């Protein structure tokens, strides 16, 4: 069961910044479209922000992507992922990512009208060729087939290839977990991480995600970079003028730094020393060469500097607890829930608790989008 604010397609007439007839609420009473069109109106108070509903966030993302020529079948999955990220207080993968997406569309590096193609390679192994488009569209095509294959065979794998990946992996796993399947996801991120003991970048942030289905409770999903922190978080800290904690990054000379800009010019470090470094190397291999995709370092050589998502595939693996335990005197769900119950007795937070709580708040109160970010979006709207 997924506990999240739904970001369904916006019905006709709903208040939306895509619709000139209605606007989302702002605490200062200003019209956010005017804020975007008249950027001098952005600075109204300390840390000014615009309150938007989840549907309005999705609609705004769609408006910007469409205005830059991205086809709806490409833009829709991206907008939904951004809305889900904003709702979950995952700002590093929310509207902020519009800047990079638009950069790649305008540079021509990504095919704005790419039609992903699903291929059943062998048995329960599936592949979606993204046709040089964005990964969310490839994911939308492939996941229903992955779910069906896993339910029929017990386990199935899906490789997303020839695409550009920017979105959070937990969002990629949500529909699989909702279908009652356990699942993994791996993707190679932008090459910016030095191996443990190294002094220059070699690997991507290389996130790993896992999901476990639950009945009558919020699903168990974790998603974390194998670097000490995601690159997007470093970028946002730099924008906010915040220093990095020790152990997150090194500068171009390989020396420790607390400055976000220096870490972005140098390298991030893996979490957990040699353990995080080894996991990152694993992701490089199974989400790179194993599925016919480049390593992050090889992909970096093809990057044109437009600020958009890196070229890189994704490997998803789905497993059916029903099939795995078929014929056994074993209630997999009861055993798992007993495990979670024991964890709760220690008053611990489970992975994804924070996201679930944020989604509930966002569904009731909307989300706050920085006016400084809205000001930057002015350049993303042609004319």
Task: Label the model's feature ranges.
Residues 7, 13-16:
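Intrinsically disordered, low-complexity segments enriched in small polar residues
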Residues 51-52, 57, 296-383:
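Catalytic-core signal marking the mid-to-C-terminal active-site face
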Residues 94-147:
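Active-site cofactor/substrate anionic-group-binding motifs, chiefly glycine-
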Residues 125-215:
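A generic, well-ordered mixed alpha/beta core segment in the N-terminal half of proteins
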Residues 193-261:
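Phosphate/diphosphate-binding glycine-rich loops and adjacent basic-rich segments that engage nucleotide
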Residues 231-292, 309:
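Small-residue-enriched flexible segments
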